[in-house]
């Protein structure tokens, strides 16, 4: 054989071997990188930093070979769970679909996919997936109520209620503004929870990927028009997350939710109190509702008579997810916590309780039949202590999350 031909042949074989080695090395490095990403993601997820965890799981998923279906399915599931927690609904739906495509074994992925589709107003596909899940888990409360919501929502949109919705541009910024609370003898102050860029906390939250929330206030001017909101004066806001506040009937005490940060432990919400002196609020003090330090306590609401503090918690003894609880407020302190039970609480999440001055309780739930996500509900307690719950329907509710109401005295006007 000609030496030149032999030499070229040897070089070609050597080149092919080198390419094969490089390909194997690339696959190996990619697999190792994916495992590192999963490990980091798990660490973030364990302490509730879902935004940071999602970034790691996304890298891990993209670095996992398509033929490795089991790992692709598991990583798609983890990514979907992060997106669900931080309310990235469309991305969550896509990730759950990937998990199911790769035969992830947990059928809950089908339920969560249906919920995400319903939250996007895709009632047809949501209904199909709720029914598929009910074939696997007959009688499941969340799927049963979700299915019913998909059937009711289109009818509610066709036959609307008498509520009129009007946007207040001056009260809304480019970021999230939510959970309003009216204050003052003439309801001329409105406290809101906001994540506007100007808030005091300069840190980006690993939970949400945006700045932590603060409490701001807007006041009415001489013409009765709302002014631009501004940060509450005094020591109310901090480097941590504050929001979802309410007031005692005498206006002397504010109850608020605060989430502190710890790089080594899960994030738990707690309820704090602040007292009013002249025009400013004091530095908040933690309100110990229970000795349980592994549960969250949030979204306080004081009953109109000042005798009860309603709040949201995932403490043991609930019905699943977040439940609404209440605790007696007395001159000697606080009583024991009581779960409101059915028909208010469900296996889903009940949140953002608030009262109308006439004693009606309003709250949001994603476990009762609704249009999608959190819907607003009204609950009235009769003389026997039984609650009657009613969905506020469209246009008060939408396929997205609807929550956080405050009422302007006895008149039929509210901010949400």
PLM segments and residue spans:
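Short, conserved micro-motifs composed of acidic
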Residues: 47, 112, 119, 123-413
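Canonical positions in the second alpha-helix
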Residues: 60, 98-99, 132-133
């Amino acid at each position: 054989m000609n030496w030149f031909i032999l030499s070229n042949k040897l070089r070609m074989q050597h080149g092919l071997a080198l390419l094969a080695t490089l390909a194997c090395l690339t696959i190996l490095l990619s697999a190792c990188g994916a495992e590192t990403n999963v490990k980091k993601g798990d660490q973030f997820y364990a302490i509730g930093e879902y935004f940071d965890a999602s970034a790691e799981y996304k890298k891990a998923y993209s670095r996992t070979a398509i033929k490795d279906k089991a790992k692709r399915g598991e990583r798609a599931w983890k990514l979907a769970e992060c997106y669900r927690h931080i309310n990235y609904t469309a991305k969550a739906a896509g990730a759950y679909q990937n998990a199911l495509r790769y035969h992830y074994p947990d059928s809950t992925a089908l339920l969560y996919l249906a919920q995400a589709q319903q939250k996007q107003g895709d009632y047809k596909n949501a209904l199909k997936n709720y029914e598929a899940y009910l074939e696997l888990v007959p009688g499941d409360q969340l799927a049963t109520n979700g299915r019913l919501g998909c059937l009711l929502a289109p009818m509610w949109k066709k036959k609307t209620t008498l509520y009129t919705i009007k946007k207040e541009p001056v009260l809304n910024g480019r970021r999230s503004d939510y959970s309003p609370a009216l204050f003052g003898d003439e309801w001329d102050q409105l406290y809101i929870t906001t994540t506007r860029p100007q808030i005091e906390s300069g840190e980006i939250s690993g939970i949400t990927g945006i700045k932590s929330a603060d409490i701001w206030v807007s006041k009415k001017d001489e013409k009765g028009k709302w002014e631009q909101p501004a940060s509450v004066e005094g020591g109310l806001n901090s480097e941590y997350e504050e929001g979802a506040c309410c007031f005692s009937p005498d206006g002397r005490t504010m109850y608020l939710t605060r989430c502190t940060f710890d790089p080594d432990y899960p994030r738990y919400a707690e309820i704090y109190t602040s007292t009013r002196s002249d025009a400013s609020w004091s530095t908040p003090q933690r309100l110990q509702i229970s000795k349980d330090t592994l549960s969250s306590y949030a979204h306080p609401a004081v009953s109109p008579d000042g005798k009860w503090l309603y709040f949201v918690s995932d403490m043991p003894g609930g019905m699943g997810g977040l439940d609404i609880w209440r605790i007696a407020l007395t001159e000697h302190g606080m009583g024991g916590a009581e779960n409101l039970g059915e028909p208010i609480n469900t296996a889903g999440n009940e949140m953002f309780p608030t009262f109308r001055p006439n004693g009606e309780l309003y709250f949001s739930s994603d476990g009762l039949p609704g249009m999608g996500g959190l819907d607003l509900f009204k609950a009235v307690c009769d003389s026997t202590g039984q609650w009657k719950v009613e969905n506020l329907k469209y246009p008060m509710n939408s396929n997205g999350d609807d929550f956080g109401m405050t009422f302007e005295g006895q008149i039929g006007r509210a901010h949400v």
